[in-house]
Amino acid sequence: MGNAGSMDSQQTDFKAHNVPLKLPMPEPGELEERFAIVLNAMNLPPDKARLLRQYDNEKKWELICDQERFQVKNPPHTYIQKLKGYLDPAVTRKKFRRRVQESTQVLRELEISLRTNHIGWVREFLNEENKGLDVLVEYLSFAQYAVTFDFESVESTMESTVDKSKPWSRSIEDLHRGSNLPSPVGNSVSRSGRHSALRYNTLPSRRTLKNSRLVSKKDDVHVCIMCLRAIMNYQYGFNMVMSHPHAVNEIALSLNNKNPRTKALVLELLAAVCLVRGGHEIILSAFDNFKEVCGEKQRFEKLMEHFRNEDNNIDFMVASMQFINIVVHSVEDMNFRVHLQYEFTKLGLDEYLDKLKHTESDKLQVQIQAYLDNVFDVGALLEDAETKNAALERVEELEENISHLSEKLQDTENEAMSKIVELEKQLMQRNKELDVVREIYKDANTQVHTLRKMVKEKEEAIQRQSTLEKKIHELEKQGTIKIQKKGDGDIAILPVMASGTLSTGSELAVGNYVGSVPGATTSGPSVPPPPPLPPSSDTSEAAQNGTASPPMSPPPPPPPPPPPPPPPPPPLPGPAAETSPAPPLPPPPPPSAPPLPGTSSPTVVFNSGLAAVKIKKPIKTKFRMPVFNWVALKPNQINGTVFNEIDDERILEDLNVDEFEEIFKTKAQGPAIDLSSSKQKITQKASSKVTLLEANRAKNLAITLRKAGKSADEICKAIHVFDLKTLPVDFVECLMRFLPTENEVKVLRLYERERKPLENLSDEDRFMMQFSKIERLLQKMTIMAFIGNFTESIQMLTPQLHAIIAASVSIKSSQKLKKILEIILALGNYMNSSKRGAVYGFKLQSLDLLLDTKSTDRKQTLLHYISNVVKEKYQQVTLFYNELHYVEKAAAVSLENVLLDVKELQRGMDLTKREYTMHDHNTLLKEFLLHNEGKLKKLQEDAKIAQDAFDDVVKYFGENPKTTPPSVFFPVFVRFVKAYKQAEEENELRKKQEQALMEKLLEQEALMEQQDAKSPSHKSKRQQQELIAELRRRQVKDNRHVYEGKDGAIEDIITALKKNNITKFPNVHSRVRISSSTPVVEDTQS
């Protein structure tokens, strides 16, 4: 059917007809065939066709019957013949009056057929045979001819101004002589064809004007526009109308019709065409033609005149204002937009809109406000531009200030980092001193405890001695024992028998220290032990000093045998030394000097952070290639970079280098170089010189020597005395690639022993001869490279070590971070306790999982929740990340490589010292060692502190320092802080959005309550509209709705214009290209 989107309305129209008796349903096969024919005739989109195919047979048969009853009986040529009959100028006026009475009805039937018939009928109407569009446009021109030219005002001069021999249609054709629109291809006829088709129009144009005046009093113009609108609703018809040289012009001329309803219809149609890509230019061209035909002084003059005069017809005023809004503000070029705006300003639009600002029509007020909202105030724009220029200057000034402040901040950060490192050093030193003091205190405390124990034991011994003495005296008084002194100073305790005689057999010898024997007893069980003598003065004195052992203590063990001869290293003395095996020998120290020349590859370069670099073979190209001016890394800079892991030579094997050379070779070159012939020529040319080096190596050496601009003597002398002023370090590193190999040295020495003339050698060979004679060449070149790069290496390594130290200390000492981890641990245990049980800690990589754990509604993550908890409950730790200093810098440091670089520097320094001991007269080495040994020592101290500080903080967080380098440890905190800040921002944004939405809802509720009191139905309708608008804003946002390339697009645009009240236009208006296949139209509503 005609309109692809009007299936339901068509079915309603079908039911409106008088339905005769229902015919019997045919067989299913025949039913499906006829249903397929009906579907093809209806020209429905695929989705609606699929819907109809799902009908049961009963509904399909009803649809077939309705469709067949609805078929238009008149073919297209019937209407075309009737319209041509009205246009025949040979018919008499009386006969014309009789014919034209049914013209409006014929046009109405034609409009219904164009709108409701299948696409085949419309294509037949428009084909080359019928040329229905041409006939319809000609009839429209004829119907409004009298109104357009106002023949009443020019009737008196018609004889002199109108050529009687020219038909009315040809005079209309002349109006479009200046049209530059492209002629339709296959859809319309040329000017000469049009003239030949109208050859029968031979009556004077006076009668034509009178007939046109008669037709203009009817609704024929309005219905003609409806017919053209129905044609334009098809892709095929729309393309024909757009490419027709006069169709749009005639539609625009219809604005002269006196019926405001017709004029509103015309403006709606023209506004819809404006929204099609390329349509705006066609509409402006039509109004240029309107200006010429109607004699306007300015374009749109008649339109503004009708807009002012038809103030009693709101629909026309809304259509006019909407058309003005679209034609002015739907332009891509801003200057052209201002130009169109000024056209209407000159016609008095601004003043008239000021009068209409209090109009009672809401629709008109919306369009007026839309125009005013989109107006460009050039003066204000100029002022804004000037303000912008001033602002840009201010911005530039502020950016410069920011740049200076950034430099100062960087310097301040470096100074602060250095101070932090120094304080950390002092702290570590104080901690070491504290550990020593604690050890001394521990030892002293142990000694004090031992002495107190000894004093206590001595006091107990004295007490026992006093007790024993008392008992001995008592026994002596009782006569039980008798004390007898001997000549040697000992005393004897003799028991007294019952008969009063002494028993000599039981005599006890007691020495000077008898009093100190606590367990001494007599032979008789009833006799108490004799009391000892008082201690001598020596014993008392020793006891007072607290150094003597307790009396009668067991004798000390015999002294250990002398230790065996100590093997290196010697064992510990004592029994442990005798039993424990000797420790293994220490590993041999690293070699103190690199191998001598000839024992290793000449590509080895000894320097900070520099590993063995493989020499890349030079590539011989067939053509001269342009130079790629990249910034190359030095050999000592590729260690640890991505370039250390890639092999470009392998890539070249996969590429088509011949094609590459052909594409990028330099201009003005002959054919490709034959490598074999070129080698022969070189050999012939250099036959007078003897070349001992390999050709490519000699060539590269020559290039390197030319860069230096020094003679061989100067270079060798500078190497001998380590003169880096004469030979820059870059040249030294380049020259190290050409250290003579063992084979080259043999060849050179052989040539020299044979006493061949050196003059026959090439410059490169003579240089290599002299170069190879330098003593310890490899060591000297290595030392020069080391000295030249030492300062740069120190400056590169020191900030990295400082960053590790500062970041480690700040993370370990941050109490706020500790609180954050405590919160995370608590929430994690709460979530996992029912399944996995509580834990006591977690790995740091678990922090990355906070973003993966989402809430039930998927709107926030666990990290968002933690951010909210911290802000609400623990505000004191909200800015915990401010306590983490230099973490990002530390994350970029490879501590392992830095420590290796420090070791390499130490090896280089040792090599330099050894060289200086051999040649202590070299002032350059002396000054270098004097000024830089301290720097290296300080760097080594920083490296030790950095290693210790990092190990401490890694262990502090439960990680293993061996498996967790800084490049893994610190980025965890960097990512966590970044994600935490983003979560804070998103929480704040969501809070603002919820607050704004709540305020909006409260306002809407208050407004709806007011409207509810007035009109409940209005409240319901408004709620629905706001809900739809909100859904569109959320889902579509700034994307414009795109009308698909299908039939019915024009109707969709016009419907959108009526419903949506387009009020906003983008700066760059998007239209759809007009193509002969699929024109797509966009709605501009934002």
Curated annotation (Swiss-Prot):
Lipid attachment site numbers (N-myristoyl glycine): 2
Domain of life: Eukaryota
Any Pfam family the entry gives: Drf_GBD
Key words of the record: Lipoprotein, Myristate, Phosphoprotein
Residues of the DAD domain: 1038-1077
Record-linked InterPro entries: ARM-like, ARM-type_fold, FH2_Formin, FH2_Formin_sf, FH3_dom, FMNL_animal, GBD/FH3_dom, GTPase-bd
Domain GBD/FH3: 23-469
The FH2 domain, residue ranges: 615-1006
Protein family: Belongs to the formin homology family.
Record's protein name: Formin-like protein 2
Organism: Mus musculus (Mouse)
